């Protein structure tokens, strides 16, 4: 790697000179590529931990991603719930790998490091592809949450991940003249260009979705913050990393701030999704109380209802729907039907003396 290398498409010379990327130790000559300034190391026993501040940030990202994942899973009827859950699972997977690779818990000289770095690169590609497809869920080209939607997302992400895994392996091993540690165009496209394209398409698709279908324009702010954090993370990583590292005396570098910016971008993705999805309370199993508003005037405040009003029609206090009499008025407040029904109404004038013989007949 030449000193003060200029940026060139397809080349990692400039980028690896400024930032400690996972793939840089496998590129270039026999010694790999290393940044001109990187954060201090910490020794824990016999283990040297590289990028300690960044590792702590990765752990914090795992905690935050878990919290967001649990919140997403609690919205049982939200649109695109299962699809965005897969995105957060993949983000957690990527962060787990980043802890072991950024910290050099898996040493760069170890024979398995190229394979883990390739798995990490493939997982990153699959993660951004999953984000891109989540951007089209809101357009309802096919129903979300169905086996077709989920399996298409899973299989396509697996295919993209396999491609983004195979290209680094071929590059690290130098399987051909077009893919070698010194010819990195394919890796440059899959590892750096492809994620940026996915974020751009996601941003444009969501802006169209908000403008065309939603009344709430406040969610545009979430998208703008997401894009801003992502762009800031890229710039901090590939442009200002050395400047930051020198300014803070090697305590942190651009990798730390770019990881933080990417975490904020993921949090904005969650915030945006949470803002545009509404839960159907009829099928919600949440623990919130008094979520229903009483609209029926019969149940409104001021209308008293007593359990005693539900008595039998023969002894109750309420009026009958027939003739305007209640049970006590109609049956003379007597305990039985046979004893009072004919004695209180028209038949009583004939039956009081014991039979029909004393009547008008």
Swiss-Prot record:
Matching entries from InterPro entries are given as:
Chs7
Q: Which PANTHER family match?
A: CHITIN SYNTHASE EXPORT CHAPERONE
A single GO BP annotation from the record?
cell wall organization
Summarizing the function annotation, the protein's role is:
Chaperone required for the export of the chitin synthase CHS3 from the endoplasmic reticulum.
How does the protein's chain sit in the membrane according to the entry? Multi-pass membrane protein
Which protein family is it in? Belongs to the CHS7 family.
Q: Which UniProt keywords apply?
A: Cell wall biogenesis/degradation, Endoplasmic reticulum, Membrane, Protein transport, Transmembrane, Transmembrane helix, Transport
Instruction: Give the species this sequence originates from.
Output: Cryptococcus neoformans var. neoformans serotype D (strain JEC21 / ATCC MYA-565) (Filobasidiella neoformans)
User: Transmembrane region positions?
Assistant: 48-68, 86-106, 119-139, 150-170, 184-204, 218-238, 250-270
UniProt xrefs under Pfam families: Chs7
Q: Which GO terms describe its molecular function?
A: unfolded protein binding
Query: Where in the cell does this protein reside?
Result: Endoplasmic reticulum membrane
The Gene Ontology CC terms held by the record are: endoplasmic reticulum membrane
Instruction: Describe, as the record does, how this protein assembles with itself and its partners.
Output: Interacts with CHS3.
The protein's predominant localisation is endoplasmic reticulum
Q: What is this protein called?
A: Chitin synthase export chaperone
């Amino acid at each position: 790697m030449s000193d003060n290398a200029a940026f060139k498409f397809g080349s990692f010379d400039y980028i690896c000179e400024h930032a400690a990327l996972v793939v840089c130790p496998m590129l270039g000559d026999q010694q790999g590529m290393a940044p001109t300034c990187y954060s201090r190391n910490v020794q824990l026993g016999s283990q040297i931990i590289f990028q300690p501040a960044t590792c702590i940030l990765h752990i914090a990202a795992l905690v935050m991603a878990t919290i967001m994942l649990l919140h997403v899973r609690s919205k049982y009827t939200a649109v695109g719930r299962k699809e965005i859950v897969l995105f957060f699972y993949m983000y957690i997977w990527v962060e787990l790998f980043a802890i072991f690779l950024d910290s050099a818990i898996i040493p760069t000289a170890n024979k398995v490091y190229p394979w883990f770095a390739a798995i990490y690169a493939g997982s990153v590609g699959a993660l951004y592809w999953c984000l891109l497809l989540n951007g089209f869920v809101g357009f309802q080209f096919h129903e979300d949450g169905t086996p077709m939607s989920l399996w298409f997302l899973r299989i396509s992400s697996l295919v993209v991940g396999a491609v983004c895994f195979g290209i680094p392996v071929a590059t690290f091993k130098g399987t051909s003249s077009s893919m070698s540690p010194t010819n990195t165009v394919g890796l440059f496209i899959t590892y750096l260009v492809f994620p940026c394209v996915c974020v751009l398409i996601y941003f444009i698709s969501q802006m169209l979705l908000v403008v065309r279908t939603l009344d709430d324009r406040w969610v545009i702010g979430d998208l703008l913050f997401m894009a801003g954090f992502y762009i800031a993370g890229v710039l901090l990583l590939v442009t200002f990393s050395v400047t930051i590292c020198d300014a803070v005396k090697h305590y942190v570098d651009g990798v730390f701030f770019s990881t933080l910016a990417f975490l904020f971008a993921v949090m904005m993705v969650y915030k945006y999704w949470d803002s545009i999805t509404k839960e159907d309370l009829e099928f919600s199993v949440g623990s919130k109380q008094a979520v229903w508003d009483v609209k029926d005037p019969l149940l409104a405040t001021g209308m008293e209802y007593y359990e005693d009003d539900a008595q039998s029609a023969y002894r109750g206090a309420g009026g009958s729907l027939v003739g305007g009499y209640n049970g006590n008025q109609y049956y003379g407040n007597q305990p039985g039907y046979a004893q009072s029904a004919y004695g209180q109404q028209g038949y009583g004038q004939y039956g009081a003396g014991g039979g029909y013989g004393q009547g008008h007949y």
